[in-house]
Amino acid sequence: IKVGFAPTGAFTYPKSNDEKDVEAAKNMMFKNITQDNWVWNVAWWNDPVYLGQYPKEGLEALAAYLPEITSEDMELIHQPLDFIGMNIYNGQMVSADDQTSWKLEERYIGFPQTGMKWPITPEVLYWAPKFLCERYKKPIYITENGLASPDMIAADGKIHDENRIAFLDQYLHYYRKASDEDIPVAGYFVWSLMDNFEWAFGYTERFGIVYVDYTSQERTIKESGKWYKKVIGSNGEIIK
């Protein structure tokens, strides 16, 4: 049995492969505490568990609000885990900036997005595992990755969710790139097997590769499900 945990968080990827952009993206992912989003959670929740200490940037910024953190607390929190788990759907593009160390790049009008209006940024499935594994020295499982879409059964009885196939193909391309470079990506779980009750959106969003009729409970494999079977059967060889 192997044990890990999967806290939520937000992730970054560099605008280019230039060393300064890469370092800026990494720093924003782990050190940023000013952006009004979830980026800070990555270090705040993972550092104590994997490194045995809270990041100094957070301790300094939140000093007036924090309770006393004792060595006994850290001994309990810092337990030996076998892997990192992360739900990764999208990321924020970052570039280097001489004044602020990093700059969040604005997305252009018409930037690709899912049915939930989440940005589609497949590069993050390479860069986020790379940054996480470099920092925490553990293999990583992608515990969630997928696309929400207003799927429906067509006249031919099929669910033609080619947008989901394209999404998964693009993301898995970068996941394979990470694997090819010996980044220890240990596993990938598509979200989700079936359409389900999404914790913040109820039954309004469909993530499944299997369609669920919520009235009759009948299940129908979507075209993405048939495609994903081929991905598994080929061990990813059909990924473009």
PLM region descriptions:
Residues 1-240:
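Active-site region of glycoside hydrolase catalytic domains
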